[in-house]
Amino acid sequence: MAKLTRRSFVGIMAASTTALSMPSLAFGALPRVVVIGGGAGGATAAKYIAKDSKGAIDVTLVEASKRYYTCFFSNLYLGDFRNYGSIGHNYYGLAVNHGVNMVHEWASSVNSAEKKVYLGSGATVSYDKLVISPGIDLKFDSVNGYSPEAQSIMPHAWKSGTQVQ
């Protein structure tokens, strides 16, 4: 029988504590990473976590929209170098080519103590690690006199979509 030293005991305790802090690992499941936001940052993070882990990490991307239009390619559309449809991307490739689980719902809140993402439907998604990449949006009440109705008069064009078309 191998001699149990203080150093090996501390190592065993540290490893077991780490496993307990990641619930999916404690029960033999794959570690779970949830990414909130399917824009350029979130989709790229989900893709490379899944790709680089070679299936060793269960990756879920939470994004309400089923299609993402790249703001940074909108100039190609506006300059008549590309059509509008060509700057839009769905999430099919992430799911099929990289094994990313897609959840097309709004992430309404996060409980970091329970390691859960609450969805607009009331469902939850558990995680071991969380990436939050919601992208850009506008809080209309933060700009005096600006409202959702005013954006048709003075477009902000922060999000690619109808204001770009």
What is each residue range found by the language model?
Residues 105-114:
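A conserved short coil-to-beta-strand element within the FAD-binding core of flavoproteins
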Residues 119, 132-133:
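Redox-cofactor binding/interface segments in oxidoreductases and associated redox assembly factors
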Residues 13, 134-135:
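Glycine-rich, N-terminal phosphate-binding loop of Rossmann-like dinucleotide-binding domains
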Residues 27-101, 149:
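Beta1-alpha1 glycine-rich phosphate/pyrophosphate-binding loop at the start
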Residues 121-129:
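Core beta-strand elements of the Rossmann-like FAD/NAD(P) dinucleotide-binding domain
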Residues 135-165:
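Glycine-rich dinucleotide-binding loop and its adjacent helix/turn
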Residues 1-17:
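N-terminal secretory signal peptides and thylakoid transit peptides that target proteins
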Residues 15-29:
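A short, basic/flexible loop-to-alpha-helix module at the beginning of a structural domain
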